[in-house]
């Protein structure tokens, strides 16, 4: 009996392990796993349902069917445990061993493992140095391979056909050996001496010069070294023994009616066994070679299908023509083992239901239906019932609960008290998608949710469902309460803004209450306090919006900081305010001034208000305040009684005339087009322009009319005040709707797009109040349907982007406080087109300064390096006008395997410095992925209005100051005395008196400068102007024009202007030129001086050559005198076709995948002077001579726009040919900082367009992960191979080791990988395999004998350990510390013992943690 009780006590202790290793199994290893050989293909006897002996389900091999009972029934009961029945040979034990015991099949002929053969690049091919095609021919018995050439002229591994073989046998007899099939390949593999091969390859690598060979050798070397290091023998890639999966993992289930449902694996195994047995028999019978060969080939194919069906040839199919699911299919893909069972498990103690609004709840509560709670907390209730003695057994308790007796409800209340539950709404796109609440029991069947947390869950009450989960253990409850409780998560981790902002009716109520009206009832009255105002309002003496004077008591921070002094003291002030605002002042938290409420509260204002409360009053007060705001908002909205009707949509009276005028203009353009003055494209662009301007004008007229209304003030004068129109108030407050939607209701609907994105040129002139006619309705259906289709696509794409981002960053966790680096990036305000898009304060808030921040006026240090810049700091920095701050960034963090808190800065979701253990990688991925669904999917065609609006024609200063030009600015003075810019990348800056940069503007080539360097100017002064429609070609030298290759009809064509009748020459496109000869020439101009000599570039022997691009209109004549700064030709900007701008989600994906754009711009590889070399066919040759005098050539297609001209000095990394930038080039030539700035700015552009705020540091975290691999350029004395890509941390560790040993470290280049590539190339094979390309990843890992140190989150989830983040990080740290201290104690005791016996002391070996196989 005691043994029985002990048995129940033994809880299987899970083994503690720190790593998992994968490798190739040797045949002996497979046999050692096996409990017996499966000899027969039979499964179970269909009459008795007992497994057949020696078959696939044999009880003798795999274990008993029933617990502690042998097959024939001779031994039953526990007492026979471990006995092997002599009748049926079955061991008496637990039936669950059928899930663990494996069998094996001895193959009659060896078989190649298809993964190592067919998974590209073929591992077998690499080891043998043969092509995949050749190996396949040998394996599938189509050709012979020479094993030992002997004394013959044949070479080893040579392939020969059967015919060849017989001829050679006749010629040389048995001097040589050739084989076919897997035996042959196995012999070749056995013959390989790996160490020797590695040596030869290393020497070959050093001595060879050809790129292709280096690549090939390096690849082979990598595979061979892997075998060498892991101790795996190459011949193990050929199987002699096939393991058989335990039968419970490939079950056979009897259905009713005598049929069976079976796993496909059983079919596949049966086929292998049948063919194997047939082959054995044929070999015994000494059958003819050709029959045996065919059988061997069939066996190879059967094993192939079992391992990876469909990898080679046609997939094996079952009875219903469906391909069978092989072992490989079991683990890969969304339904495979990794993603279905290991990363996404079903959860006990959970339920789901529809959500309804719970306006009476506190922020940290949720309403839980009683029945649901009863079910979820059942075990807790059973326990309580037993403890209280209401029920004696679990069974009795169960009955009690099922009958729902009153005592059960009381106990439920008790159990639920202070026991948080977690609510989750799918899709969980960021961490706020799961939050913890304290349950409040309610009647009904729907979960009640607090309205303020809806924004975080992205929930609404139109039928959304949510799931409830119960944290069981004490630790889980504690974490849920401290970390996940809704009232502790009030900020968005993406940008640090409050997530508990009111929306819709709350906003409307607050807005209505804080508006002011002219001449409201009781205007001008004075009140002694808020209570008096409330009394007057309740008695209808005053209206909500009336202006009154009120004495208001504010609680302000106490200046007196001494002991026992109260933190807040009252301060009484008389405010001119409105009744509504005075009433709201009641709920103001201590420490906030009344001024924050003394304005109309729109949605943005309320968000700012809550943010201020959080920063000034702390979390607790903010949560209470938000709750009270919500209550007030609902109450006031109800009291306001706002509703809308058709009459609220006021159509502007000017609409008719505006639309009429537009129609006239359109007719005029049609007429011009008919008479051939404009092209069809121009006409279309103009028409679209007119209509979009018209709908703007109508919209503006409508808004003007809606937004104000005439009133009479107290003195009887007519004035206008902001309107109380319901529709206007809803849009203005941010409660619902927008100006655009109102425009469709009361203005005109405007232009519509076709499904392909092009705009239909006839707009919808009606609005919804007037109603649409049939045609208009039909046109608008396009857009509506496309919207729905787009949304569906977008969700999938956005989800996939998030998945890739999470995968690449999942192992990035904050692991230490400070890595001590002195690197960082310089942050400036982000300026575009002279506008400040993102202020400096927003970019440095919550970052750690890396250099001292100095007051520019007094030169004293304001903030030392290492200071976390909070709100007060950034406000001070902004006030002093500091325009650049160097801050720490995740990109330059020197922590290996993780990040440090200082480089990351503030945890945006908590508002303080990030904690060690925070999974910042996943947070970054979620912050970028979550708003993905709000981005657009389409590619924008910028044409017509949009492109014209985007073109500027001048720059003007926004602030007073002094003009300064950058070093790259060059200009010449023309005959009229104007300064003409001839540099491509010149910029003008405005600096203040202290020389601090205030703004910066690009000044394009050909602009006329109106202010020169050093001029003092006022805000609003124009700095430069230019013609936006054409780009000029300007001469920097004077002289007589001499044309070269300018031949009419060959390189140029004459164009006659319809209106003026003047003729100009236009350079024709290369493709349209007739003869071959004329394709390679380039029309250009040389200048002659007074003596008829060619004008030279000063200081060189080169003549001045000015080339004309395709489409240029040449404005000078041959032989004409020109002055410096004169225009030789103009290139119409229209000729630069409207280029498609990839926007939205595809653009973000493109950036993170680090794709090189097609037609990328070219950057200068070196710093030097440019010149043009001899042109080749269709290409121009640009030469850069560096400072040492070396020449670097670039070949550039003729139609590309070169941004530099002769003899210009360019810097390394400067753009010399126009086009989209290639991130890889930026990294190579400008470094990590420039790359990060490029990616961050580009990604932010996309999100900013949609009004989404994301903090830069999230994008930087992802860029860090994209840069985590390096390419070895010189391997020094390390184990790396030149050209190999390795993990940065590995390389740094190895280099540290080399330096410690006094050897030569490796040198390397940074490599930028796209997120998919980066995820697949992580060190953890478990994580990579669960992401994509499972087969390839596992094949590679097995050969390398890779060890996964379980550093990331994903690997740990998969093996079922606590993840090394948050509390899990602390847990693992503590565990490892305890292990090492235990080990030290063990060593110490061992040493003492050894000393006592006077035995010679041997060095104690550290017991290493065994890696689980």
From Swiss-Prot:
Q: Which reaction does it catalyse?
A: RNA(n) + a ribonucleoside 5'-triphosphate = RNA(n+1) + diphosphate
Query: Which is a GO BP term held by this UniProt record?
Result: DNA-templated transcription
Residue ranges for the region (Disordered) are 1392-1413
Q: How is the cofactor bound?
A: Binds 1 Mg(2+) ion per subunit.
On whether Nuclease is a keyword of this UniProt record, the answer is no
Disulfide pattern: none
EC numbers for this chain: 2.7.7.6
Q: GO CC terms on record?
A: DNA-directed RNA polymerase complex
Q: What sort of enzyme, by top EC class, is this? A: transferase
- Which SMART domains does the entry mention? RPOLA_N (SM00663)
For this entry, the protein name equals DNA-directed RNA polymerase subunit beta'
- The organism's lineage? Bacteria, Pseudomonadati, Pseudomonadota, Betaproteobacteria, Burkholderiales
């Amino acid at each position: 009996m005691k043994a029985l009780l002990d048995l129940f006590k033994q809880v299987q202790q899970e083994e503690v392990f720190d790593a998992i290793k994968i490798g190739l199994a040797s045949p002996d290893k497979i046999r050692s796993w096996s409990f017996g050989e499966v000899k027969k293909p039979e499964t179970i006897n269909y009459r008795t349902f007992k497994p057949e002996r020696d078959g696939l389900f044999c009880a003798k091999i795999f274990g008993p069917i029933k617990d502690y009972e042998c097959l024939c029934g001779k031994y039953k009961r526990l007492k026979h445990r471990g006995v092997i029945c002599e009748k049926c040979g079955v061991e008496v034990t637990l039936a669950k061993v059928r899930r663990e015991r494996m069998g094996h099949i001895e193959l009659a002929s060896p078989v190649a493992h298809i993964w190592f053969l067919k998974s590209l690049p073929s591992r077998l091919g690499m080891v043998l140095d043969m092509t995949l095609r050749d190996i396949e021919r040998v394996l599938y018995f189509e050709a012979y391979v020479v094993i030992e050439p002997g004394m013959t002229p044949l070479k080893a591994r040579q392939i020969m056909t059967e015919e060849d073989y017989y001829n050679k046998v006749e010629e040389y007899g048995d001097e040589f050996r050739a084989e076919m099939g897997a035996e042959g390949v196995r012999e070749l593999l056995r013959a390989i001496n790996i160490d020797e091969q590695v040596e030869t390859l290393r020497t070959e690598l050093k001595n060879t010069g050809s790129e292709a060979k280096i690549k090939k050798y390096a690849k082979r070397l990598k595979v061979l070294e892997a075998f060498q290091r892991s101790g795996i023998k190459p011949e193990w890639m050929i199987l002699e023994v096939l393991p058989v999966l335990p039968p419970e993992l490939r079950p056979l289930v009897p259905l009713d009616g005598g049929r069976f449902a079976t796993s496909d694996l059983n079919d596949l195994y049966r086929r292998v066994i049948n063919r194997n047995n047939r082959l054995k028999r044929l070999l015994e019978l000494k059958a003819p070679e050709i029959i045996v060969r065919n059988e061997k080939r069939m066996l190879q194919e059967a094993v192939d299908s079992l391992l990876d069906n469909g990898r080679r040839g046609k997939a094996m199919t079952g009875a219903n023509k469906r391909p069978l699911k092989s072992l490989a299919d079991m683990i890969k893909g969304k339904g495979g083992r990794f993603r279905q069972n290991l990363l996404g498990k079903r959860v006990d103690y959970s339920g789901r239901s529809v959500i309804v609004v719970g306006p009476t709840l506190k922020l940290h509560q949720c309403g839980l239906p009683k029945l649901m709670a009863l079910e979820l907390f059942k075990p807790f209730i059973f326990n309580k019932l037993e403890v209280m003695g209401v029920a004696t057994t679990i069974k009795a308790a169960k009955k009690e609960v099922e009958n729902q007796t009153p005592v059960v409800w009381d106990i439920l209340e008790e159990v639920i008290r202070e026991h948080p539950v977690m609510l989750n709404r799918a899709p969980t796109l960021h961490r706020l998608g799961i939050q913890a609440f304290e349950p409040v029991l309610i009647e009904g069947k729907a979960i009640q949710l607090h309205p303020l947390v809806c924004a975080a869950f992205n929930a609404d009450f139109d039928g959304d469902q949510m799931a409830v989960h119960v944290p069981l253990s004490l630790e889980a409850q504690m974490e849920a309460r401290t970390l996940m409780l809704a009232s502790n998560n009030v900020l968005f981790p993406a940008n640090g803004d409050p997530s508990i902002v009111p929306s819709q009716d709350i906003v409307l109520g607050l807005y209505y209450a804080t508006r002011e009206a002219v001449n409201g009832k009781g205007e001008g009255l004075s009140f002694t306090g808020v209570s008096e105002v409330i009394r007057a309002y309740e008695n209808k003496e005053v209206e909500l919006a009336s202006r009154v004077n009120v004495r208001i008591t504010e609680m302000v921070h106490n200046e007196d900081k001494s002991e026992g002094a109260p933190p807040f003291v009252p301060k009484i002030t008389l405010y001119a305010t409105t009744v509504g605002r005075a009433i709201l002042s009641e709920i103001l938290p201590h420490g906030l001034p009344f001024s924050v409420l003394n304005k109309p509260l729109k949605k943005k204002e309320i968000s700012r208000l809550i943010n201020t409360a959080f920063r000034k009053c702390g979390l607790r007060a903010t949560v209470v305040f938000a709750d009270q705001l919500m209550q007030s908002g609902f109450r006031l909205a109800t009291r306001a009684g706002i509703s809308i009707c058709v009459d609220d949509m006021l159509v502007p009276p000017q609409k008719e005339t505006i639309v009429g005028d537009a129609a006239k203009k359109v007719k005029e353009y049609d007429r011009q087009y008919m008479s051939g003055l404009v092209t069809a494209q121009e006409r279309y662009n103009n028409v679209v322009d007119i209509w979009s301007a018209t709908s703007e004008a109508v919209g503006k007229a409508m808004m003007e009319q809606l937004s104000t209304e005439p009133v009479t003030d107290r003195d009887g004068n007519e004035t206008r005040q902001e309107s109380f129109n319901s529709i206007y108030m809803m849009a203005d407050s941010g409660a619902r709707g927008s100006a655009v939607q109102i425009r469709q209701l009361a203005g005109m609907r405007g232009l519509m797009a076709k499904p392909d994105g092009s705009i239909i040129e006839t707009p919808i002139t009606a609005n919804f109040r007037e109603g649409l006619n049939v045609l208009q309705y039909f046109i608008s259906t396009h857009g509506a349907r496309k919207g729905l289709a787009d949304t569906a696509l977008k969700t999938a794409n956005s989800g996939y982007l998030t998945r890739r981002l999470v995968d690449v960053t999942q192992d990035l966790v904050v692991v230490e406080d400070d890595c001590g680096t002195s690197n960082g990036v310089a942050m400036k305000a982000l300026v575009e087109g002279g506008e400040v898009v993102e202020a400096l304060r927003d970019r440095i808030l919550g970052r750690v300064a890396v250099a001292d921040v100095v007051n520019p006026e007094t030169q004293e240090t304001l903030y030392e390096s290492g200071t976390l810049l909070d709100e007060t700091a950034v406000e001070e920095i902004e006030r002093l006008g500091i325009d650049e701050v160097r801050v720490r960034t995740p990109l330059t963090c020197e922590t290996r395997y993780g990040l440090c808190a200082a480089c990351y800065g503030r945890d945006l979701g908590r508002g303080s410095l990030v904690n060690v253990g925070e999974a910042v990688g996943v947070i970054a991925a979620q912050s970028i992925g979550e708003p993905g669904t709000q981005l657009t999917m389409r590619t924008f065609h910028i044409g017509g209005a949009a492109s014209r609006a985007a073109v500027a024609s001048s720059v003007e200063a926004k602030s007073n100051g002094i003009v300064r030009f950058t070093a790259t600015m060059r200009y010449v003075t023309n005959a009229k005395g104007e300064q003409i810019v001839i540099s491509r990348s010149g910029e003008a800056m405005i600096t203040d008196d202290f020389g601090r940069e205030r703004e910066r503007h690009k000044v394009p080539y050909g602009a006329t400068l109106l202010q020169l360097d050093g001029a003092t100017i006022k805000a609003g002064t124009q700095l430069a102007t230019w013609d936006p429609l054409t780009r000029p070609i300007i001469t920097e030298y004077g002289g007589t024009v001499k044309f070269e290759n300018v031949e009419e009809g060959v390189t140029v064509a004459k164009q006659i202007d319809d209106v003026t009748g003047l003729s100009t020459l236009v350079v024709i496109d290369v493709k349209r030129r007739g003869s071959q000869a004329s394709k390679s020439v380039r029309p250009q101009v040389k200048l002659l001086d007074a003596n008829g000599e060619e004008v030279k570039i000063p200081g060189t022997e080169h003549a001045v050559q000015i080339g004309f691009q395709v489409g240029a209109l040449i404005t000078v004549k041959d032989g004409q005198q020109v002055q410096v700064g004169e225009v030789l030709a103009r290139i119409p900007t229209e000729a630069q076709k409207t280029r498609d701008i990839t926007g939205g989600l595809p653009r973000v994906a493109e950036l993170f995948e680090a794709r090189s754009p097609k037609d990328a711009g070219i950057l200068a590889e070196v710093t030097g002077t440019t010149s043009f070399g001899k042109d080749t066919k269709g290409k121009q040759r640009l030469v850069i001579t560096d400072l040492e005098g070396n020449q670097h050539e670039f070949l550039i297609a003729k139609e590309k726009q070169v941004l530099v001209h002769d003899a210009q000095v360019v810097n390394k990394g400067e753009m010399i040919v126009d086009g989209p930038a290639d991130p890889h080039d930026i990294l190579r030539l400008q470094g990590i900082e420039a790359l990060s700035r490029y990616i961050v700015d580009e990604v932010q552009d996309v999100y900013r367009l949609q009004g989404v705020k994301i903090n830069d540091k999230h994008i930087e975290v992802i860029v860090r992960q994209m840069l985590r691999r390096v390419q070895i350029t010189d391997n020094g004395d390390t184990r790396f191979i030149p050209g190999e890509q390795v993990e940065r941390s590995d390389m740094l560790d190895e280099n540290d080791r080399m330096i410690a040993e006094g050897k030569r470290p490796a040198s390397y280049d940074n490599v930028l990988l796209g997120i998919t590539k980066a995820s697949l190339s992580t060190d953890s094979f478990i994580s990579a395999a669960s992401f994509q390309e499972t087969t390839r990843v596992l094949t590679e890992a097995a050969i390398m004998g890779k060890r996964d140190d379980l550093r990331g989150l994903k690997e740990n989830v998969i093996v079922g350990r606590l993840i090394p983040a948050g509390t899990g990080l602390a847990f693992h740290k503590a565990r490892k510390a305890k292990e090492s201290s235990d080990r030290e104690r063990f060593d110490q005791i061992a040493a003492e013992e050894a000393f006592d016996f006077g035995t010679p002391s041997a060095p104690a070996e550290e017991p290493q943690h065994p890696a689980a196989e």
